[in-house]
Structure formats: C-alpha cells, structure tokens
C-alpha cells in the first residue's frame, strides 16, 4: 500500500477543484491499479490468477506448467520470477513474494512471445498511437523492461493490438483515464 500515492491523488483532486488541469482523473487512477485493471478484460489476457494462497499458486502451476509470478506493486521488472514445468524453487518464490500469505501476488501463464518484446501501446483519449515501443528482453532475461536492460524498438501497431487497445482505451477514457500505457505480449495484455 502506497499511502503517498493516495495522498497525491487527493491533492490532485483539490488542485483540479481550484482550476488546475489534471489529465487523468485522480479517482480513476486510484480505482484502476495498474496490474489489477486488466482483470476486467479477460478476453484480452492470458490465464491469470491473483491470490495470497500458496496452494492456489501450486495448482495454477500444475495446470499451466510454465508461469510468471510478480508482486502487484512492482515496476521496472523488479520481483518478476519465471518458474518452469519442474517447479524448481516455486515454494521459495511464493514465500518471498507473498510473505507467507500476507501479500497478494499475480501469477500468469508464461507467454513465450515475450522473446519478441513486451509492446507498450500509448493510448490518448481512447485511441492508440500508430506506433508501439517493443521492449525486448536481452540475453538470458525474460524481462523486457528498459529498467531491467531490455532494448526499446519502435514498431508500427498491428491491427490486433490496435483493436485491443481501442476497446480498453475507450472504456478507460470514459472513466477519466485519458493518457494510458498498455503492455501487450503477443496478442495478450
């Protein structure tokens, strides 16, 4: 929980009432946490689990074989782990990320398309920009984040990515989120 973020959004609301132009509505920012907001669009995401329960993570791993585990409050690729079909070190990773059940984490089926990059789509008032920034993992990394050493490459947006970004972007624009970035791996958000 980031109390400073909450305070900042309340201060931005006050600034807005006093006449300042605020691009993204502060309440909308509070109500759409980055990683959880995607759960509203299951048709655009790969298999995903949000839980505190270690046993639920183990069942998800057994079902999907190769998974990604990440903290809900992480950024820049920090705290992201890949676990292969053998489950090597899964217990330790779960303990590290969820502090023995105290912290909720996200688990997703591994998408091998990450090798081609995690595409960042810029959406302005519901409309995606014509180009994306593909953040491509380097070396033995699975993280494409620039902060984790990924290489950024501009690419034209695909028709599929445009349709996905437009569907999500228009819904979020109606809620006051006018400037957003959407991450897409392969065809999945």
What name fits each language-model region?
Residues 54-55, 62-66, 73-168, 172:
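Phosphate-binding site of ATP-dependent enzymes
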Residues 170-189:
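Conserved metal-phosphate-binding beta-hairpin within the catalytic cores
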Residues 1-52, 56:
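Conserved N-proximal alpha/beta basic substrate-recognition cap immediately N-terminal to
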Residues 26-30, 135-137, 185-188:
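Short glycine-enriched loops at secondary-structure junctions
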Residues 22, 67-68:
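Hydrophobic beta-strand scaffold residues
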Residues 43, 62, 177:
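Structured loop/turn residues at beta-strand edges in well-structured enzyme cores
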């Amino acid at each position: 929980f980031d109390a400073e973020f909450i305070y900042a959004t309340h201060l931005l609301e006050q600034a807005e009432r006093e006449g300042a132009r605020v691009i993204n509505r502060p309440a909308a920012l509070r109500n759409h946490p980055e990683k959880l907001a995607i759960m509203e669009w299951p048709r655009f995401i790969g298999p995903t689990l949000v839980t505190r329960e270690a046993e639920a993570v183990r069942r998800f791993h057994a079902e999907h074989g190769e998974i990604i585990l990440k903290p809900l409050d992480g950024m820049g690729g920090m705290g992201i782990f890949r676990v292969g079909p053998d489950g090597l070190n899964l217990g330790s990773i779960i303990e590290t990320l969820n502090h023995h059940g105290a912290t909720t984490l996200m688990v997703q089926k591994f998408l091998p398309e990450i090798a081609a990059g995690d595409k960042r789509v810029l959406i302005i008032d519901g409309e995606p920009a014509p180009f994306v920034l593909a953040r491509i993992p380097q070396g033995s990394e699975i993280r494409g984040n620039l902060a984790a050493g990924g290489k950024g490459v501009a690419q034209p947006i695909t028709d599929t990515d445009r349709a996905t970004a437009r569907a999500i972007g228009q819904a979020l624009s109606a809620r006051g989120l006018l400037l957003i970035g959407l991450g897409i791996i392969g065809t999945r958000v």
